């Protein structure tokens, strides 16, 4: 992704807070970010039976930004040594085993989680709410004067800071 800022959004189709946050993020993307060189890269939980729930959640929430998931199949195949590492080597051309296990690698033990990356893909913010995300991107792009779609919400801010 060649964007000035990239938002990483980690979510779970069964997460109650994700069901509230996702529509806000989609609105923010459509009404502010899409035309301002800000991309959203969404990583959903899609293991086991969650794969169908993941696809349905994307459809139901009209998620137009990039959506990916690591499935049980993909992770298990990457660890499988019986195929002479052929599949693993092909996969490692684009990713790592650590990134497939993103929950441990990136400390994602509760959802939703929002990270912001700069143009060099360095993390400049993590575990922020949608209102904090909007304020931050507006400020970074010198657009503080724009009306806010999502005013600060202390409950949402506290939820995004949770570790579990």
Regions found by a protein language model. Name each.
Residues 1-6, 30-31:
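A short beta-strand-turn-helix
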Residues 7-8, 114:
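Hydrophobic beta-strand anchors of alpha/beta hydrolase catalytic cores
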Residues 9-15:
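Aromatic-flanked redox-active Cys/Sec active sites in thiol-based oxidoreductases
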Residues 67-70, 127:
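Short acidic-hydrophobic, aromatic-tinged amphipathic segments that line or gate anion-handling sites
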Residues 143-164:
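Non-globular targeting/processing and membrane-anchoring segments
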